[in-house]
A protein has these predicted regions:
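A helix-coil-helix interface module used to build multimeric assemblies
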Residues: 1-147
Length: 147
């Protein structure tokens, strides 16, 4: 995004920090589901939420890990494991990278759409107001761009 043309709310949605936070939430929710099914210990899912929620994801550190692993999600999971500890072994079980990436993209699109739809509602209200304000304003007729 070009900063001078971007609104802070949109920049925040598409920032690496937000992307990694969403990735964490997707992984943690998946762990909740696995715990509910008895696949992983409930205590592990709880620990993942507690320690992962408190984590400050370091974009530069994740990028550095990715340069070695050549895989964005593996780099993130490696970084996340530093915060979670031994229970990190339960994260990403039965998932593929696409499960995380596609779901994250859908979340980001939804958040961005919410902003756009609110703005469009404001634009439509302004257009309606102007249309009624000028409904009796005389204008020069035009045909094929000629007065």
């Amino acid at each position: 995004m070009i900063p001078r043309y971007s609104r802070p709310e949109m920049v925040a949605i598409w920032s690496p920090e937000t992307r990694f936070r969403i990735w964490f939430e997707i992984e943690a929710y998946a762990c909740d589901a696995l715990a509910e099914l008895g696949v992983i210990p409930r205590e592990a899912a709880k620990t993942i939420w507690e320690k992962g929620s408190a984590a400050k994801f370091d974009v530069e550190a994740i990028d550095e890990i990715e340069r070695v692993t050549k895989h964005d999600v593996i780099a993130f999971l490696t970084h996340l494991a530093e915060f979670v500890g031994p229970d990190a072994r339960f994260i990403h079980q039965g998932m593929t990278s696409s499960d995380v990436l596609d779901t994250c993209f859908a979340v980001q699109l939804t958040r961005a759409s919410d902003i756009l739809l609110t703005d469009i509602d404001g634009l439509l209200a302004a257009l309606k107001r102007r249309a009624f304000e000028h409904k009796n304003t005389v204008t020069i007729g035009r045909s094929h761009g000629i007065h």
